[in-house]
Every structure is written in structure tokens, then in C-alpha cells.
């Protein structure tokens, strides 16, 4: 009798394991995690001066402030006229990564964490200052964003976090009143959370390249922060990775909300991300050694 009961129990267990409904209930928390592709809406091919375009930030719905990652020149590019309408030399040649407009000022960061402030950038004689932060070359700062409600800048780390952790990519806050950096991270993008978006029975074709990196013990090979921006409508933080062409979206309190993949060959080397005031999302791409750089308006809706 005991032997028969054991057979019935094992059979029931096997049926439960093979029951698709049982599998579904066990993975309900993953079923709503799906990587969505963002396709391009408009593409703006850029002149030779911006072949190595890095960061972008919008003055208005037409004019984009931009930098090139090798020279200390600030470019103002008009999307409607398809031309550079102004140039401003702010520093010598260096490795400049991102910029952001904050009120009447523009801030630019280099990879070693040197922050430039261009005060009253619209004036004929803007004042330029620089601030050395706690970051160094090994941190490889590539993202810079502005949170107006908190009056602070955000720095996105591509390389080493300040606490040397490898399981996440951190964002740090710089207070614009005190002009001081908080060395404790403001946000953390957990890399295993990114990985969880690619688990399941069906793996999208564009994620296969990404999944090859998951076997690496160093999880930083999964996602490299190349730019960050703040959605002016939702206050969400958008983190761009040129590695695997991904965008991770964090809620204002730092929770991973969404992962997007960039679709199309025009995303040669995505290095900049920005919203226009009306909530349109744009990506800037270096030329990748072929052709011209570009700015792409994405088919994205808040």
C-alpha cells in the first residue's frame, strides 16, 4: 500500500512539473519582463566636425548642444537647418564624454571626472570654470544628467565604481548649491536584473550577442554606461549602454522599470542620449569609423 502511494505521489509530482500552467505560475514575476525594441523615427546625418559626437543636450526643440570626444569645443547644431550654428571653445583637447544644460549654464564632463561649468552660455563672454571631482581615469565617467527638482547633476560610471563593486553600475549626485560630489551612490543598476530580462523560452535575436557576455565572471561586461539623461515628464533616469545597444530605465526612486534595445544599423556607436522639452527621445552616434555621425529621434512615447 505504501509502495502504491509512493508511485501516485511521484506521478503527480511529474505531472505538475510538466504542466505548463505550473511553470507559468512559477515564473509570473518574469513574464512581464520583456525587452522592447526602439526603432528610429528621424535620422540627422552630421557634418565632419561631429564624426566623433559624444554627448547631447537640448536648448529647445530644434537646437542641440553637443560635444566631440577629442576637442574642447561646444557645438550648437540646428536640427531644422541641418547645420552647426555656433561654436564655443571651452578647454584644450581631452576625452570629453557628456554634457547637460542646467538653467543658464552648461556642464561638461571628461572621462577622468573633471567637470566644466560654462556660466551663462548664451552670453558673448561666458565664464568657464572647472571642478575636479573624486573620480579618476579608472572610473571612466561617461554619463552626465540634470535633476532640476533636486538641483543636482548625475554622473554615470562606465568603469570602476567608487566602492569598487562589480555587480552594478552606479550613478552619483553632484549638488549644484555646494558644488560638492556625494561619494555614496544615488542609484545602482544591478546587472543581474538586466540579465533577468533576457531569460525565458524565447530569446530575441538581438539579445544573443548580449547573452554571450553573461558567462563572464566580470559582470561589468554586460552593460557599459555611455550616457544618461532624465525624462523631463516622468523624472525617470535613462541609462544608455553602447555595449549591446541597450537603454535601462530607472524610476525616480531607483528601481529598474524597463529595458529597451536599439534596433537598426544606424546605431553605429551610441554615445549620447537626451530628451527634448516635449519628451521626444534622441540618441547620438559616433560614426564608428565609417561615414558620418548622426542624431536619431526614436519612436518613443511617454
Model-derived regions: residue spans:
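Sequence/structural signature of beta-propeller domains
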Residues: 18-302
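C-terminal motif of bacterial Sec signal peptides marking the signal peptidase cleavage site
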Residues: 13-16
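Sec-dependent signal peptide recognition
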Residues: 2-9
Amino acid at each position: 500500500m505504501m509502495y502504491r502511494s509512493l508511485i501516485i505521489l511521484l506521478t503527480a509530482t511529474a505531472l505538475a512539473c510538466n504542466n505548463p500552467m505550473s511553470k507559468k505560475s512559477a515564473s509570473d514575476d518574469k513574464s512581464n519582463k520583456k525587452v522592447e525594441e526602439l526603432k528610429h523615427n528621424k535620422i540627422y546625418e552630421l557634418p565632419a566636425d561631429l564624426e566623433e559626437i559624444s554627448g547631447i543636450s537640448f536648448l529647445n526643440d530644434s537646437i542641440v548642444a553637443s560635444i566631440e570626444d577629442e576637442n574642447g569645443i561646444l557645438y550648437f547644431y540646428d536640427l531644422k537647418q541641418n547645420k552647426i550654428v555656433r561654436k564655443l571653445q571651452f578647454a584644450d583637447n581631452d576625452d570629453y564624454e557628456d554634457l547637460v544644460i542646467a538653467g543658464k549654464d552648461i556642464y561638461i564632463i571628461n572621462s577622468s571626472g573633471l567637470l566644466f561649468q560654462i556660466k551663462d552660455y548664451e552670453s558673448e563672454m561666458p565664464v568657464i570654470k572647472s571642478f575636479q571631482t573624486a573620480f579618476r581615469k579608472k572610473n571612466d565617467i561617461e554619463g552626465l544628467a540634470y535633476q532640476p527638482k533636486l538641483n543636482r547633476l548625475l554622473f554615470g560610471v562606465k568603469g570602476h565604481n567608487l566602492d569598487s563593486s562589480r555587480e552594478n553600475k552606479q550613478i552619483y549626485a553632484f549638488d549644484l548649491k555646494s558644488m560638492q560630489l556625494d561619494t555614496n551612490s544615488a542609484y545602482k543598476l544591478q546587472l543581474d536584473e538586466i540579465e533577468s530580462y533576457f531569460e525565458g523560452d524565447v530569446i530575441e535575436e538581438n539579445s544573443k550577442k548580449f547573452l554571450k557576455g553573461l558567462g563572464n565572471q566580470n559582470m561589468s561586461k554586460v552593460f557599459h554606461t555611455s550616457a544618461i539623461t532624465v525624462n523631463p515628464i516622468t523624472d525617470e533616469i535613462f541609462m544608455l549602454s553602447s555595449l549591446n545597444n541597450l537603454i535601462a530605465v530607472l524610476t525616480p526612486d531607483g528601481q529598474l522599470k524597463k529595458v529597451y534595445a536599439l534596433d537598426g544599423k544606424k546605431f553605429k556607436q551610441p554615445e549620447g542620449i537626451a530628451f527634448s522639452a516635449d519628451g521626444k527621445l534622441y540618441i547620438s552616434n559616433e560614426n564608428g569609423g565609417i561615414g558620418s555621425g548622426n542624431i536619431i529621434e526614436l519612436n518613443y512615447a511617454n
